[in-house]
């Protein structure tokens, strides 16, 4: 099978399901914000964010390359579109690629927030209203697939 098929958004249609794919790492756009937080509170660098994790080790986790998942969805004919989430679910250029007349709704209550992002949020250094517009909350890619 030829895997060089371009992923575009022409196949996305009303009723498709949008699935957020988990990433363990933070995006490169998050580092400047975290650096400002650490400049204000250097003690956070070695802080324990939950029973098992420290901030520094969580910051060092790599983002996921979704190659296997994307290729599998393409091979089955299920992939209608996909975009990488940089910075934020809300401020993502991928939403602009939806076909004319289609819109997406993100239910933030359905996203299980990783301990790293919960910890950063609880530091309350950038404001609760701003936080979801600056961090991807652990969703690294969104794929559009048939709802059934």
Pin down the residues of each PLM region.
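Glycine-/charge-enriched secondary-structure boundary and capping motifs
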Residues: 52-58, 64-148
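Glycine-rich anion-binding loops of enzyme active sites
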Residues: 1-31
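Short, surface-exposed linear patches
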Residues: 16-22, 40-44, 104-106
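Glycine-rich, acidic
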Residues: 26-72
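Short, solvent-exposed coil/turn linker segments
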Residues: 2-3, 25, 43-44, 54-55, ...
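Secondary-structure boundary elements
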Residues: 10-13, 40, 75-77
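Surface-exposed beta-strand edges and their flanking turn/coil or helix-capping segments
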Residues: 8-10, 32-36, 95-97, 118-121
């Amino acid at each position: 099978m030829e895997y060089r098929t371009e992923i575009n958004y022409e196949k996305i249609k009303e009723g498709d399901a949008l699935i957020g794919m988990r990433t363990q790492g933070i995006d490169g756009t998050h580092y400047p914000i975290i650096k400002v937080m650490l400049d204000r509170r250097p003690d956070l660098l070695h802080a324990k964010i939950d029973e098992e994790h420290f901030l520094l080790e969580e910051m060092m986790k790599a983002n996921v390359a979704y190659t296997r998942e994307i290729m599998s969805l393409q091979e089955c004919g299920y992939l209608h579109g996909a975009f990488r989430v940089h910075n934020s679910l809300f401020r993502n250029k991928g939403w602009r690629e939806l076909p004319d007349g289609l819109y997406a709704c993100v239910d933030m209550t359905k996203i299980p927030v990783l301990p790293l992002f919960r910890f950063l949020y609880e530091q309350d250094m950038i404001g609760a209203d701003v936080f979801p517009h600056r961090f991807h909350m652990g969703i690294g890619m969104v794929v559009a697939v048939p709802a059934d």
